[in-house]
């Protein structure tokens, strides 16, 4: 059962440590996983790890043509190696969030290393894009625990997980499979995770957007699906 609790929409989540590897989280904790169903918004989010530009240009062009804005979780490494695409993201008005610098499993790092991953990425984004990533971050691979969340929170970051995994990271992912999964399971309030390096997601995007439009749903940012003003990228 999906529910929203206040504006922050914080829910208890026991989930996988990565999209492809099930791992029981031994300790309950709260994080943002789902938005407000009454908003009529589905938040499409795109992660950029250490891969190249991938299909990012195609995704940005599709969104630009339709006047849509999403949230992109960017690693500092990706921004450093794709400065023109990174600057286009800001120029197009998208919400920018933090995905660490070099995409490590944060649960394996010391507190100081976690802080460095987040703070240095924010500095890179500021230097290259003229934007900031606070208050949102997404742990690489979805790997997080109570300590990671507490350390991130002390640095001004709130974890944004997802309620629907597109499956675009699978080795044999196809546009049909990605579109089919999203359209079968998506509901207003969902936070959907996709990846800028996925050709399958880029090719599926027009199909997904057309069907959302037919259903009367709107695509928006994390801030919008949470009923908040756009806090990140400022």
Task: Please give the residue ranges for each predicted region.
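Terminal accessory/targeting
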Residues: 1-45, 57-71, 187-234
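Active-site beta->alpha N-cap acidic-glycine motif
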Residues: 24-109, 113, 117-128, 133-134, ...
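Short beta-strands and strand-loop turn motifs
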Residues: 43-45, 98-100, 160-166, 190-195
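Active-site beta-loop-alpha junctions enriched in small/polar residues
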Residues: 49, 75-77, 101, 140-142, ...
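Alpha-helical scaffolding segments of alpha/beta enzyme cores, especially the outer helices
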Residues: 58-61, 84, 88, 116, ...
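Non-membrane alpha-helical structural segments and their capping/turn regions in soluble enzymes
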Residues: 111-116, 176, 183, 199-202
């Amino acid at each position: 059962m999906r529910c929203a609790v206040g504006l922050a929409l914080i829910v208890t989540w026991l989930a996988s440590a990565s999209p492809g590897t099930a791992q029981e989280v031994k300790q309950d904790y709260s994080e943002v996983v789902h938005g407000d169903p009454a908003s009529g918004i589905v938040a499409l989010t795109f992660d950029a790890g250490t891969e190249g530009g991938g299909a990012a240009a195609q995704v940005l062009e599709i969104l630009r043509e339709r006047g849509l804005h999403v949230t992109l979780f960017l690693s500092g490494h990706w921004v450093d190696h794709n400065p023109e695409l990174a600057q286009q993201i800001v120029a197009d008005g998208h919400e920018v969030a933090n995905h660490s610098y070099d995409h490590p499993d944060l649960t394996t790092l010391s507190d100081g290393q976690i802080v460095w991953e987040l703070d240095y990425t924010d500095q890179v984004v500021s230097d290259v894009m003229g934007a900031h990533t606070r208050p949102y971050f997404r742990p690489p691979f979805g790997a997080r625990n109570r300590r990671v969340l507490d350390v991130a929170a002390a640095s001004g970051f709130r974890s944004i997980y997802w309620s629907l995994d597109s499956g675009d990271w699978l080795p044999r992912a196809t546009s049909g499979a990605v579109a089919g999964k999203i359209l079968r399971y998506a509901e207003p309030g969902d936070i959907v995770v996709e990846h800028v390096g996925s050709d399958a997601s880029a090719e599926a995007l027009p199909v997904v957007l057309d069907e959302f439009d037919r259903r009367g749903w709107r695509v928006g940012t994390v801030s919008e699906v949470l009923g908040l003003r756009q806090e990140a990228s400022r």
